[in-house]
Amino acid sequence: MHDAVVTHIDNPGPLTLASRWRMTFYVATAVGIVSMIAALAVNANRAWNVYLVAYFMFLCFGVGGLFFTALQYAVNASWVVVTRRVSSGLSAFLPAALILYIGIIIGAKQIFPWANGPMFEDPLKLKWLSLPWVAARDMAIILIWIFFAWKIIGFALKQDETGDVMLTRKAVNWSIAFMPVFAFSFTIISFDLIMSLQPHWYSTLFAIYTFAGMFQSTVALITLIFLWMKRNDGPLSKVATPSHTKDLGTFIFAFTIFMTYIGFSQYMLIYYANMPEETIFFMKRSSNGWEWLFLALPLFKFILPFFGMLSQGAKKTEKWLMAVCVIIFVGQFLDIYWLVMPAMHETFAPTVWMEIGIWLGFAGIFGLTVSRFYSRYSVLPVKDPYMLESANWRFWE
């Protein structure tokens, strides 16, 4: 508990990361590369599908960190300033995501049915789902995200040096501009990478569904890193309060409910309408062994996080909150896996070493890029005009 009013904050500087962490990230990256090469030799189709699962999960973390940062700027939230540099760091993965998209292009014929030849009579849809056009717009979208991250987070980093209050106003304006851009661009990339796996199927709720999963899991990741940085005299230990922990827990709880609402709404509407061109999506994903994963998703995405975070005390208990965050990560991976794999694999028959190995590769690259950001810049925006207000946040105590 922090009972005294904070009147001055020393700059903790960049994160000093133990060498074992960096070595862990390098090893994970190497494991991923070796696993991908071996997987391509064993089953190229499955390898590229697993690549897409891991790619989309970490892409969501990257843009999710940017979205969370921009959202807090846009609404002028002061309590979250202590955590802002944590969320900003996640966007450091976006340049790597742009490069890793080349893998999606290389494996496109193994991933997307429409990449193997014309599938549509509609000339507009035929042009929309052509590999050059899909790759061009998706990479352009990631470039746009990188540009907004450079502007919004760049203002905050410059403010660390100058203390210019007007930089906050500029960050707010750019964040507001980013909101509609994000909504449109994330919808497009969700359609291109996931919904187009079954090109004759569509859902008007699909982009909201992928957004809900993205935001729930991203806030869980932000919370996990934040709690790690504030424990054992970490760099955030002197400014982080139980109220920050409680508010992040409340965010997770709220978007667990939102995720469930959207997921149920999509299922209920398709089930009730009972139109063959829509029900095929769930038919593929609730038979031939996939039903077990279908039934597991509510457990990891709703039941465990919801009841685990239902009490006020649970949201402020750090070890418990960290455990819930891990459960949400597992749920997010299983959800994306369930969205991707049944489109090309009729029977649920996971190749565990392939899934874990390729995922570790992406986790390693993500860890290297994000930790590099934390190691270069201060983990606190100490000259932000709302910094002291955030450090004195005591709403839930």
Task: Give the role of each language-model region.
Residues 4, 21, 118, 300-304, ...:
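TerminUS-proximal long segments
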Residues 18-34, 128-297, 384:
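Long, contiguous internal "core" modules enriched in hydrophobic/ aromatic residues
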Residues 91-107, 254-263, 323-330:
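Hydrophobic alpha-helical membrane-insertion segments
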